[in-house]
Amino acid sequence: MAMNYSAKDEVDGGPAGPPGGAAKTRRPDNTAFKQQRLPAWQPILTAGTVLPTFFIIGLIFIPIGIGIFVTSNNIREIEIDYTGTEPSSPCNKCLSPNVTSCACTINFTLKQSFEGNVFMYYGLSNFYQNHRRYVKSRDDSQLNGDPSALLNPSKECEPYRRNEDRPIAPCGAIANSMFNDTLELYLVANESDPKPIPIPLKKKGIAWWTDKNVKFRNPPGKESLEEKFKDTIKPVNWHKAVYELDPEDESNNGFINEDFIVWMRTAALPTFRKLYRLIERRDDLHPTLPAGQYFLNITYNYPVHSFDGRKRMILSTISWMGGKNPFLGIAYITIGSISFLLGVVLLVINHKYRNSSNTADITI
């Protein structure tokens, strides 16, 4: 039996179905997206449009990069490594496994005065806070003061969820590994006078406002913090309970302790720094940290040699762009210079071949 051919049938995806049945077709819906009729714009790249773009990018990026680089260089910063792995280091004695509590002192010199507010950081190296299991090892409901989560922490906190059949507060690997060295800074104002001047270190104002006031809360109730946490136990590696982090200041104790909050904000890279203290400017007439001799008193509690880590203390001022970061300025200058150089090269090529084309046209 012969079948009549119909161009319409081919376009529609096949012959019509039996009478009364639904028409079968493989043709996509007649929409602009499925029929690829969406409006499009394709720039026509000519020398008149490309060359100015390269030059404009170069002329914008280079001055911005120079400004950022100069600003970064004007930031005062000094790093003091106190890991103690070197035999000559004053903190080398603290690496002995038999030492339970150790203190050491490191002398250093500030060659230039530090103006304005000065920020003291502690820095760690080779510490991978971005490990997936480590990052997830916390209970945000518990940290937000939820009474039920306080007594029944999340399973994400394992193996730091319970100890001695009691819930750990705060639970998880992040809290368990909290940095606990104590750093004190002193100025040697007069070498003939052995009594140093302690530098006042402010321990509040170092955490993000949203963390301090929204994400972290102590359990509700009028009882003392010790009563609120009486059915819990401290993390395995802690020397004291969470309600003893700052017993002299109730607004900085427990889950809302700012040292604890800063530590709980995990770092993305294995080498990082976290804000430890603030050194506020006294007045406009005197530098915050005058040039001279200083020494750093360290209560060495935090072990890093087991994972080949390093510890350091950083003193730094800041600017409108934050802390010292020469890379950003160098990146802007590099990109701007490459763009400007490409513009010059393309301009020479365009000028050369355009003249050759004009000469060929005249010859013909």
UniProtKB/Swiss-Prot annotation:
Disulfide bonds join C91-C104, C94-C102, C157-C171. GO terms for molecular function: aminophospholipid flippase activity; structural molecule activity. GO terms for biological process: phospholipid translocation; positive regulation of neuron projection development; positive regulation of phospholipid translocation; positive regulation of protein exit from endoplasmic reticulum; protein localization to endosome; xenobiotic transmembrane transport. It is a multi-pass membrane protein. InterPro entries: CDC50/LEM3_fam. Signal peptide: none annotated. Residues 2-49, 350-364 are cytoplasmic. Expressed in photoreceptor cells; detected in retina outer segment (at protein level). Detected in hepatocytes liver sinusoidal endothelial cells and kidney brush border of the proximal tubules (at protein level). Expressed in brain (at protein level). The keyword Oxidoreductase does not apply. It is found in: Membrane; Cell membrane; Golgi apparatus; Cytoplasmic vesicle, Secretory vesicle membrane. Residues 1-28 are annotated as: Disordered. GO terms for cellular component: apical plasma membrane; early endosome membrane; endoplasmic reticulum; Golgi apparatus; late endosome membrane; phospholipid-translocating ATPase complex; transport vesicle membrane. Its main location: membrane. Residues 71-328 are exoplasmic loop. PANTHER family: CELL CYCLE CONTROL PROTEIN 50, CELL CYCLE CONTROL PROTEIN 50A. Belongs to the CDC50/LEM3 family. The N-terminal domain seems to play a role in the reaction cycle of thr catalytic subunit such as ATP8A2. Accessory component of a P4-ATPase flippase complex which catalyzes the hydrolysis of ATP coupled to the transport of aminophospholipids from the outer to the inner leaflet of various membranes and ensures the maintenance of asymmetric distribution of phospholipids. Phospholipid translocation also seems to be implicated in vesicle formation and in uptake of lipid signaling molecules. The beta subunit may assist in binding of the phospholipid substrate. Required for the proper folding, assembly and ER to Golgi exit of the ATP8A2:TMEM30A flippase complex. Component of various P4-ATPase flippase complexes which consists of a catalytic alpha subunit and an accessory beta subunit. Interacts with ATP8A1 to form a flippase complex; this complex forms an intermediate phosphoenzyme. The ATP8A2:TMEM30A flippase complex has been purified, and ATP8B1:TMEM30A and ATP8B2:TMEM30A flippase complexes have been shown to form intermediate phosphoenzymes in vitro. Interacts with alpha subunits ATP8A1, ATP8B1, ATP8B2, ATP8B4, ATP10A, ATP10B, ATP10D, ATP11A, ATP11B and ATP11C. This is Cell cycle control protein 50A.
